[in-house]
């Protein structure tokens, strides 16, 4: 709502912006018309140099990164933006109906409402190198998120050569999902989409790491960001690449 926009010296913050890097399918819904826009996220840069051990065995069919909000296991902010309610529904279908084995990171001590409890493992918080190892040891990653600008675990999973199973309604990160990386699902197509994904994995259809490294990272995304900035201000110093500072 225009009246609710933050004002600085009587003008909308947007009026001071020369260009937007965004994550949206339809940026015009969120960004003022007439401002240059580029589909670019921090996750375009954060995964290309991660250590990948291609010799690790596959121990799990899927991994889900779903940190609990508290020891009472109630849904708070993290559970909301990670979409734990849909994650649990997916896990139930994946393990109870399809017989898949999963590892749920971050929910140690919290119940998961499924019958085949022997088909899931839960962990507490794990250090980043261990998380990457678990991703590599999984056949795919479950990402049910919607309110997510561009989930880091998605591109980290791609860099670990692990395909992705992603909520079609995710706000950002959707651009990484294609016939080289994985599939989308909706709440009504979980079983069907997961079956397609597993069949494709069995037939070696996917090459997620190759896709990510060839289409994102410093050389590709850095060149695109440089060109975008130069289009806004041609007087910027010459350089080969520009990148975001990644956390």
Regions found by a protein language model. Give the residues of each.
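Short hydrophobic beta-strand element within catalytic cores of glycosyltransferases
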Residues: 163-167
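A charged, aromatic-enriched C-terminal amphipathic alpha-helix characteristic of glycosyltransferases
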Residues: 188, 201-247
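Short alpha-helical donor nucleotide-sugar binding micro-motif in glycosyltransferases
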Residues: 132-138
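Aromatic "clamp/platform" in nucleotide-sugar-dependent glycosyltransferases that forms part
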Residues: 145-146
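Catalytic core of nucleotide-activated saccharide and alditol-phosphate transferases
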Residues: 1-76
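Conserved catalytic-core segment of nucleotide-activated headgroup transferases in glycan assembly
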Residues: 45-122
């Amino acid at each position: 709502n225009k009246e609710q926009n933050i004002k600085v010296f009587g003008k909308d913050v947007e009026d001071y912006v020369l260009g937007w890097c965004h994550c949206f399918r339809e940026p015009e819904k969120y960004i003022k018309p007439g401002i240059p826009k580029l589909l670019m996220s921090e996750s375009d840069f954060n995964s290309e140099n991660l250590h990948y051990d291609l010799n690790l065995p596959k121990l799990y069919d899927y991994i889900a990164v779903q940190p609990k909000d508290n020891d009472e296991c109630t849904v708070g902010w993290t559970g909301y933006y990670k979409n734990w309610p849909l994650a649990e529904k997916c896990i139930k279908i994946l393990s109870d109906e399809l017989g898949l084995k999963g590892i749920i990171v971050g929910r140690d001590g919290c119940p998961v409402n499924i019958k085949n409890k022997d088909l899931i493992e839960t962990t507490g918080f794990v250090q980043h190198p261990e998380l990457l190892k678990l991703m590599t040891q999984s056949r795919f990653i479950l990402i049910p998120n919607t309110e997510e600008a561009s989930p880091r675990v998605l591109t980290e999973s791609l860099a670990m050569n692990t395909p992705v199973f992603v909520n079609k309604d995710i706000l950002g990160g959707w651009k990484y999902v294609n016939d080289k990386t994985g599939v989308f699902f909706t709440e009504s197509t979980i079983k069907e989409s997961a079956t397609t994904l597993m069949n494709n994995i069995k037939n070696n259809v996917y090459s997620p790491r190759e896709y990510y490294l060839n289409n994102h990272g410093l050389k590709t995304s850095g060149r695109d960001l440089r060109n975008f900035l130069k289009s806004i201000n041609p007087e910027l110093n010459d350089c080969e690449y520009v990148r975001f500072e990644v956390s």
